[in-house]
Amino acid sequence: MISLKFPNNEVREFPENITALEVAKTLSPRLAKEALCASINGKLIDLSQKISESGEFRLYTFEDDEGKDVFRHSSAHLMAQAVKRLFPKTKLAIGPAIKDGFYYDFDPEESFSPEDLEKIEAEMEKIVKEDLPIERFVLSRDEAIKFFEEKGEIYKVELVKDIPEGVEISFYRQGEFVDLCTGPHVPSTGYLKAFKLLNIAGAYWRGNEKNKMLQRIYGVSFPKKSMLTDYLNFLEEAKKRDHRKIGQELDLFSLQEEGPGFPFFHPKGMVIRNELENFWREKHRLAGYQEIKTPIILNRELWERSGHWAHYKENMYFTKIDDQDYAIKPMNCPGSILVYKNKLHSYREFPIRLAELGLVHRHELSGVLHGLMRVRCFTQDDAHIFMLPEQVKDEIIGVINLIDEFYRLFGFEYHVELSTRPENSMGSDELWELATNSLKEALEERGLPYKINEGDGAFYGPKIDFHLKDCLGRTWQCGTIQLDFQMPEKFDLTYIGEDGQKHRPVMIHRVVFGSIERFIGILIEHYAGAFPVWLSPVQVRVITVAERHREYGQEIYQKLFNQGVRVELDDRNETIGYKIREGQMQKIPYLLIVGDKEIEQGSVAVRKRGVGDLGQKPFAEFIEELLAEIREKR
């Protein structure tokens, strides 16, 4: 017999070699029906796997991330099987689960067309109806290589050869289809009830542009048709809110072929950017930060000292000046460190908070560039805090409170993740443990729930990541707090302590927006271009009914302009309906209509975005309410 402990701490006895699915059936018929995979002592297993050891046992459904990944990965295999049936000469590369779906990379004899997706979907439906069992088996390295060589699967042969010695080489079979895979997978193809193939894209083999370009087919899948319908509706809404589309329509920014990944901000886009930066500056001033500006290009010696040359070089751009190597900065921290190091500091000055809206450049492959969300140059709202060890917790809590204030202004909910030491890192185990525990203590004292994100910290320290949730329920990683004991050591940073001796300060790296460009992209999609009044590029448009109302319209325009309102005057010889519709299309918060009655009464007819006609108002009353709305950032 074996003992299995369940998530509710209940322990039960079972016969040895019972399968995970059989365990599920003893718990609940519904759970057995919905379960997709299981785990024993933290290791994910197929439902068909026999359990021969005691330990902690858990089942996963589509409600769990683990269940979603298994379902989507099985869907990728389903698609690959359909492709091989329809296009037998196609070679298989890789097909993982990804956030919200799956993909598979293929090397077809002839390029796939959008029409082919319909054929592939139809074949997938047939395979689902066949309800083929999905079975795991193992081969030796030589057997695995021979198996794929005989099938002409050159990419799979390469993958097998790269598997380290001593690692088990597992496969999954469903009907005539076999794929190299660690698993786990759902028990049969009949589980994969609802799916949709979305699009075809190019992808280099192994992400290396020196390799062959393959065709990647993306798809989504769900256990119920209703869930698929809901998701496709969500995609339609997301398309309407695409910041690239809205940015073009509202003339906010553009992306030019002369500079892929380098966005151009237009006058209206600069209004949004400047408002965000002005707000950022004022809040940081009140929170005790001092703003600095550091150079974009610094020499190789600096980046070697900081560790970026060894750990981040593939993401950097380089140039030569007077035969010396220089790099365009990918991060602001070394520049901030040089500002700190420029003079001697006393413990009485701490904490020292240096903030910078710094332009950074990072090398991104052209295939991953995406509007403002993934670019090659962006402005990072960095700050670096130098402090005494005993000030660490209070400073982290202070940064958390500042980030919370920013996000709540825009109506964002968020969750927090604590990212720990990555494989490619610098520093001792002791310093990493000290830094990680300091972040945990601050989060717990602040009462913020968090989840651990293993191995996703920066190379110089662990970090807290803030993930925003937008109006469509999507999450975006923006704010970050990183605790760093490494850089002060690398740059020999010191302060004079109370004892008159030199000591090493502790350093925090933190951002609120993250990338200003990316945050603007998120805001465009969150608001669908209908920004709150204080952020809107044009806050009011004055619309005249006829030629004779032009003088009064100009008077209203001038009064608003003199009060600092961003205002436009539309006195064109067009119909009033046309001018109102155009103002609505441009998502202007307030349209003021002026005609005979308004001139007579010294009023304006107000139309508010999203509300409609508010009727006539005395102009003095309207401007008082408008200025209050702007001032209070409502």
From Swiss-Prot:
Entry EC no(s): 6.1.1.3
Gene Ontology molecular functions: ATP binding; catalytic activity, acting on a protein; metal ion binding; threonine-tRNA ligase activity; transferase activity; tRNA binding
Cysteine disulfide partners in this protein: none
Cofactor: Zn(2+)
GO biological process: threonyl-tRNA aminoacylation
Domain TGS: 1-61
Binding site for Zn(2+): 333, 384, 509
Reaction catalysis annotation: tRNA(Thr) + L-threonine + ATP = L-threonyl-tRNA(Thr) + AMP + diphosphate + H(+)
TM region positions: none
Any single Gene Ontology cellular-component annotation: cytoplasm
Primary localization: cytoplasm
Entry-linked SMART domains: tRNA_SAD
PROSITE patterns on file: AA_TRNA_LIGASE_II, TGS
Top enzyme class: ligase
Segment forming the signal sequence: none
Cross-referenced SUPFAM superfamilies: Class II aaRS ABD-related (SSF52954), Class II aaRS and biotin synthetases (SSF55681), TGS-like (SSF81271), ThrRS/AlaRS common domain (SSF55186)
Region Catalytic, annotated ranges: 242-532
Subcellular location field: Cytoplasm
HAMAP family recorded: Thr_tRNA_synth
Role summary: Catalyzes the attachment of threonine to tRNA(Thr) in a two-step reaction: L-threonine is first activated by ATP to form Thr-AMP and then transferred to the acceptor end of tRNA(Thr). Also edits incorrectly charged L-seryl-tRNA(Thr).
NCBIfam families linked to this entry: thrS (TIGR00418)
Protein name: Threonine--tRNA ligase
Organism the protein comes from: Carboxydothermus hydrogenoformans (strain ATCC BAA-161 / DSM 6008 / Z-2901)
Name of the gene this protein is made from: thrS
